């Protein structure tokens, strides 16, 4: 059983404030939610289990029980998850406020301990002080957190997470902030709490405390497309698709890291809860993570033989050719932008390849084919440039004054001509490596200009950012007809 979950279940009975703050979906009646196979820690109840996606950020960080309350660590309502979430630079004073919140919600004194022991011993089989009956008393106060970086902002979700060595398929990584506070001060807090426990439970408490307060922080993970809801990924290839999210909001005016101080004044806390409401947002999928996902899928479907072919049709419109036909049944081709990029890139590659080396037709087997698979994946700058350089070198360029050139005198379509004029100012007869890189970048940037894209989608924005963008009508970017260049 998850220690944090058990502590919330038992401690919520001691007063009105706790009954409100410590209310977890996992301790209430279960409501069905989409089952998944993602393993990790639920940020709401801290148990390690199968996770489902959050309705506030579409990432997998909530269990199927807690999902009924729709809480997200990015909310603006002072529920327990939000009050345990800190952002960016965390100071010693802010950590002291967090410890005070824990001490307020999970007090440990002689009266509380006797009360819990008395309630437990009403059952004949529970006369001994066994850990399974007193799990809620064995939750130490630690500065253990799950951290995530979203577009330059680092969020720390504090809690008590059991079984730290279990499978973690989420973008969150364990981080220990005890050094920012003070190990000895934290030790003293826990030794005082431990002194109220029966001797048979003190050893277990101490073991749990030291294992969760002395661990080495993990390396921070990179967020990728697999960390977001499969429902979002399945609809990425629809340019008009918008992600629907809900956020729990309130009129909370505190600085981000000071939300935990609200429990010190129960009256003020309940006044803020009276302003609680849900806000709905429809946001664009436009970001580097999802763009790279689409370009990677398209890269796997590349048919390099088109470069050596003599087809008059565009690369994605070749049919009944054993070597050049593209499988159009994949949903990635539903995005007309991907098709336009693919057609232009391969029309250009064919034009400057066929004039420089003696190549035949569709069935030709050329060395450059092995480098073509990364030609669309511009998000991975190192691999992409390596791919272009290798293709360029396969064309046996002529070197003059330490600059390599290839000839460019082959038929191209009007769309590519427009790109050439826009990117290098003319339709050239010779090309350098820099010209080739600039031209292919221009083709891709016309629709997906990753230079100006945020890394993660807008679903990871705080409510303040979402409100500002919503006011400026920028949460929804209509991708159906206007390119980045336009």
Swiss-Prot record:
A motif (pLxIS motif) lies at residues 480-483. A motif (IKBKB-like degron (ILD) motif) lies at residues 479-483. Keywords: Host cytoplasm, Host cytoskeleton, Host-virus interaction, Inhibition of host innate immune response by virus, Inhibition of host IRF3 by virus, Inhibition of host IRF7 by virus, Inhibition of host NF-kappa-B by virus, Inhibition of host RLR pathway by virus, Interferon antiviral system evasion, Metal-binding, Phosphoprotein, RNA-binding, Viral immunoevasion. GO terms for molecular function: metal ion binding; RNA binding. Residues 1-81 are annotated as: RNA-binding. Its main location: host cell. Residues 82-176 are annotated as: Important for cytoskeleton localization. The C-terminal region is phosphorylated by host CKII/CSNK2A1. Phosphorylation of the DSGXS motif is essential for host NF-kappa-B inhibition. It holds the Pfam family Rota_NS53. It is found in: Host cytoplasm, Host cytoskeleton. Residues 42-79 are annotated as: Zinc-binding domain. Belongs to the rotavirus NSP1 family. Interacts (via C-terminus) with host IRF3; this interaction leads to IRF3 degradation. Interacts with host IRF7; this interaction leads to IRF7 degradation. Interacts with host CUL1 and CUL3. Interacts with host BTRC. The integrity of the zinc-binding domain in NSP1 is important for degradation of host IRF3. This is Non-structural protein 1. The lineage of its organism: Viruses, Riboviria, Orthornavirae, Duplornaviricota, Resentoviricetes.
């Amino acid at each position: 059983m998850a220690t944090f979950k058990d502590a919330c279940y038992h401690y919520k009975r001691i007063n009105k404030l706790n009954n409100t703050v410590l209310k977890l979906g996992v301790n209430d009646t279960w409501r069905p939610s989409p089952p998944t196979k993602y393993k990790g820690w639920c940020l709401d109840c801290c148990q390690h289990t199968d996770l489902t996606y959050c309705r506030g950020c579409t990432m997998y960080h909530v269990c199927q029980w807690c999902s009924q309350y729709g809480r997200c660590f990015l909310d603006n309502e002072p529920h327990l998850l939000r009050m345990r979430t800190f952002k960016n630079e965390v100071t010693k004073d802010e950590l002291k406020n967090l410890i005070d919140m824990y001490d307020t919600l999970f007090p440990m004194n002689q009266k509380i301990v006797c009360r819990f022991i008395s309630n437990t011993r009403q059952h004949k089989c529970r006369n001994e002080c066994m850990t399974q009956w007193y799990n809620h008393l064995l939750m130490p106060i630690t500065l253990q957190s799950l951290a995530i970086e979203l577009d330059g902002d680092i969020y720390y979700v504090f809690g008590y997470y059991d079984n730290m060595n279990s499978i973690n398929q989420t973008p969150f990584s364990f981080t220990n902030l005890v050094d920012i506070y003070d190990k000895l001060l934290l030790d003293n807090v826990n030794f005082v709490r431990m002194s109220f426990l029966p001797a048979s439970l003190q050893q277990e408490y101490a073991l749990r405390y030291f294992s969760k307060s002395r661990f080495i922080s993990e390396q921070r993970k990179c967020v990728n497309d697999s960390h977001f809801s499969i429902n979002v990924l399945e609809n990425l290839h629809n340019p008009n698709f918008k992600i629907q999210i809900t956020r729990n909001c309130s009129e909370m005016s505190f600085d981000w890291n000071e939300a935990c101080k609200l429990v010190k004044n129960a009256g003020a806390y309940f006044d803020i809860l009276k302003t609680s409401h849900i806000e709905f947002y429809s946001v664009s999928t436009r970001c580097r993570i999802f763009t790279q996902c689409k370009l990677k899928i398209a890269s796997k479907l590349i048919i390099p033989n088109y470069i050596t072919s003599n087809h008059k049709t565009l690369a994605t419109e070749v049919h009944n050719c054993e070597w050049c036909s593209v499988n159009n049944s994949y949903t990635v081709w539903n995005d007309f932008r991907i098709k336009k990029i693919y057609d232009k890139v391969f029309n250009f590659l064919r034009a400057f390849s066929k004039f420089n080396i003696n190549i035949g037709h569709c069935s030709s087997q050329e060395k450059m084919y092995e480098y073509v698979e990364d030609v669309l994946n511009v998000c991975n700058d190192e691999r992409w440039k390596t791919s272009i350089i290798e293709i360029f070198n396969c064309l046996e360029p002529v070197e003059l004054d330490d600059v390599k050139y290839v000839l460019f005198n082959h038929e191209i379509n009007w769309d590519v001509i427009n790109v050439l004029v826009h990117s290098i100012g003319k339709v050239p007869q010779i090309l350098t490596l820099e010209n080739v890189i600039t031209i292919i970048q221009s083709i891709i940037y016309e629709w997906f200009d990753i230079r100006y894209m945020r890394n993660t989608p807008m679903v990871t924005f705080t409510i303040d950012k979402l409100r500002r963008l919503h006011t400026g009508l920028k949460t929804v970017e209509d991708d159906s007809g206007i390119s980045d260049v336009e």
